[in-house]
């Protein structure tokens, strides 16, 4: 995850590291994957465990259903168990990717980890100071405030992600790709962070790049 020691974000370049995690797969997977649910790849090889990330928003591109997640989650090219085929990765500079979701159905929803879900009706851009929430497989649903917009983050090895939404929501390994939202509005997908600050790829930019709509 990110290693960002500065809380004052205006004009600050924060250092970062990738945010996928390795773990044993859960016993089963739901037919429809909601935002914030765990995603794990098919086995990358003998003796190696799958990669984990979190699902973002369900989208439609020319009537084909996909799940958004972080681009650094899909850059390995492995398909996702019980979900679908890995489609693409946009990382670095931006940080988003798609996974085919042929068995999914219904509207784009976020797992609130209390037995309920939140339907996402539209994409938007938050205001600095606004209350927002995120959902992820590791830290579940957590909320905080927007600290800044259009933030640049350094992953190391010359890799940067630009234009991110910064929040004070704590995140953990495996949360990458999870949705940033509030009520019925989706704002972004998690690129990374730590227990003090987190950064999200803005959702409107991703939808425009794909020519997509929310499912």
Task: Describe each PLM feature range.
Residues 4-6, 16, 75, 135, ...:
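Residue-level detector of bioactive/disordered segments in secreted/extracellular proteins
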Residues 1-29:
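Secretory targeting and sorting signals
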Residues 25, 79-83, 114-115, 126-130, ...:
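Short amphipathic alpha-helical surface micro-motifs
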